[in-house]
């Protein structure tokens, strides 16, 4: 399995860089950037590993003796370690810019051992630094760069951005009866494209996407010449799998979501990301079809989704119009899901230690 790596600059990003000489060569010059400890802990909980990459002009020279560098540097590493934050590697270029070496950022020599391993998840690994040279380094190793700016884009902002990009999944399921391809982004809104061949079902999934705040790409091809059963069932299975995988790390999750009556149809939905599949479905429809969708498949869709997502779901609706009832169910589920997947902290939302 490929590893998510954050290649992080030191001076100006992890710790303050002195403006007078740009050297952290004494304990009293060591100052951590705001929110750095809590942010790295949160990112670590999402499976990230850290590599420090730093240019230290003239390290080992008379103007910057290595022993002067080592004291605050190892003190810094020990503080990180005391909070459970471990750097897998510390890569240091000791040269001046005029030395024209091939290891000074944005050159890539220091990182070649990491790149040769071919075990980096390039879609979800980043270079983080405060300088343009850090962004150039990111480009040179084909990773996304995130520039730290203390007043405009600090560690809280960086952490939110990484987690937002991290909660993405793509799942494809192909059988003799259907082909289902789903991509979703839990923290990206209003970028959905849904095509199942069932117009009313498309409309319901669009409502789910809008009200959950989850962008969805859904392409479903099934044996609609027979009926809509396999297409709707397998869409529910794959959507549940994609949501479950995107929520693989549940640290900080709200976990629970609920909505009370909405619209004239009085839809209720209660959700628990419990890892225990269970569905309580209370709805009665007057007609066999709404548009081109069989109303019997509404419950079966939620059942398929519950089983593959491994959630506990209670949904209830009352109303006179089948269209409004079904639509309010999807809206209510979306609203409840929005609350349940929201990140509110750093800890696992259970006393069991596993979810």
Swiss-Prot record:
Pathway: Amino-acid biosynthesis; L-histidine biosynthesis; L-histidine from 5-phospho-alpha-D-ribose 1-diphosphate: step 6/9; Amino-acid biosynthesis; L-histidine biosynthesis; L-histidine from 5-phospho-alpha-D-ribose 1-diphosphate: step 8/9. Mg(2+) binds at residues 9, 11, 130. Gene3D superfamilies: HAD superfamily/HAD-like, Imidazole glycerol phosphate dehydratase, domain 1. Residues 167-355 are annotated as: Imidazoleglycerol-phosphate dehydratase. It is found in: Cytoplasm. Pfam families: Hydrolase_like, IGPD. NCBIfam families: HAD-SF-IIIA, hisB_Nterm, Histidinol-ppas, PRK00951.2-1, PRK00951.2-4, PRK05446.1. One of its GO terms (molecular function) is histidinol-phosphatase activity. Residues 1-166 are annotated as: Histidinol-phosphatase. The active site is at residues 9, 11. Its EC number is 3.1.3.15, 4.2.1.19. In the N-terminal section; belongs to the histidinol-phosphatase family. In the C-terminal section; belongs to the imidazoleglycerol-phosphate dehydratase family. Its cofactor is Mg(2+); Zn(2+). This is Histidine biosynthesis bifunctional protein HisB. GO terms for biological process: L-histidine biosynthetic process. Keywords: Amino-acid biosynthesis, Cytoplasm, Histidine biosynthesis, Hydrolase, Lyase, Magnesium, Metal-binding, Multifunctional enzyme, Zinc.
